[in-house]
Amino acid sequence: MIFIFYGCQKNQTWIDTLPKPWTLSEAEFSSIIKKFNKRYPDFNDRLKQFSKWQVGKPYKIFCLGEETLPDVDPIFRMDVSDCTVHILTSLASIQSQNWNQAKSNLIKIHYKTGVNGENIPSYKKRWHFTTDRLLFNPSTKNITDSLLDEQDIQRISLILNQKQNGDEFLDLDWTKKVSVGYIPNNMINNELLNELPSIAGIAFVKKSYFKMGLAIAHEGMIIDNQSIIHASQEYEKTVLMNFLDYYFTDEGPRFDGVMFFTFHPLRG
């Protein structure tokens, strides 16, 4: 146990010596990402340590785009983040040796594959809905149903991107009917967290969103079965904190339940 603790401290000490990622040029980022790959050969460990390096990054909602209309934001960036951008840019970066490769990997993760197997940045091909991504994107695989007995899972059916009045939530010419299982608040505890791997994704369910064709209001990463790293609009930056303390406030739970997912390398 002492050795493990020392190893964790050593990792954090090295990360603390690095310049903050949002202050770096593309060349400086490329140099440091090579060191992450060499220092942390294990995929999940590298993702965890890279995510810790992001703590403190300024928050900006909806900050990735296609660099062309209708969304001219950058395809890949390190200067700001929101909850989903933290997940996607971290996943892309840890599978890369430089800035350009991270951008290329981000495209593979953030956009649906076309009929010819290509990933082309396009607003309508983006994985806009976290629920859709967890159920069908191989980089972020839903594990919610494996964590509890069937009777402890809440289930809903909804049509993604279809509002209660039948209109689309986003102008995508796309809807999808899905069945979603999530863990209700009365089942969220330390025992549940101990069932997770050392790093796992968490997505927060908001029932009031169902009528808009949405299920997920926020997402982040659970590390070491107890802490959450997430880009927070409330804190205006990426933060690391105790998950249960964050989720259960004096006024009650922040959300109506959660989904969990695991992270996976790109194929091919």
Where in this protein do the model-derived segments appear?
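Bacterial Sec-dependent N-terminal signal peptides
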Residues: 1-16
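Cationic-aromatic interfacial patches
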Residues: 13-85
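Residues that form generic nucleotide/phosphate-binding pockets
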Residues: 32-35, 50, 54, 105, ...
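Acidic/His-rich structured neighborhood in mature extracellular/periplasmic domains
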Residues: 57-183, 195-198, 203-206, 216, ...
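Contiguous, non-catalytic segments that form substrate-binding/exosite surfaces or channel walls
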Residues: 188
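Short, surface-exposed secondary-structure edge patches
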Residues: 191-195, 211
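C-terminal soluble interaction/assembly domains
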Residues: 204-268
